[in-house]
Amino acid sequence: MTLKRMDNVGIVVESLDTAISFFTELGLKLEGRATVEGEWAGRVTGLGTQRVEIAMMVTPDGHSRLEISRFLTPPVVADHRNAPVNALGYLRVMFTV
């Protein structure tokens, strides 16, 4: 099996509207917006029952997507912002502008 393309990157934010506005200014287009909730969604993430507002944005070339999430339940864990650069997990997403 070989990689064909990068499909999407997920980011959790405090304000979905602010994030959509920011990435729209950079040239991404809003592809869709929805609320995802229920036990089935919790099974995917391992968080149990959850309620999340999501927005899917697509890059101008149409090759990649940015999935922006705002968790309503369970509450977000905010202390990751003080994590050092070598902490496991998401660190950055880079775009050519």
PLM feature spans:
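Short hydrophobic/aromatic-rich motifs at helix boundaries and adjacent loops
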Residues: 26-28, 74-77
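Core segments of cupin and vicinal oxygen chelate
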Residues: 12-63
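Vicinal oxygen chelate
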Residues: 5-14, 53-72, 79-97
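A short, acidic/glycine-rich surface segment
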Residues: 38-43, 75-81
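Basic/polar N-terminal segments that are highly enriched at the extreme N-terminus
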Residues: 1-2
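Histidine- and/or cysteine-centered catalytic micro-motif in compact active-site loops
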Residues: 35-36, 71-73
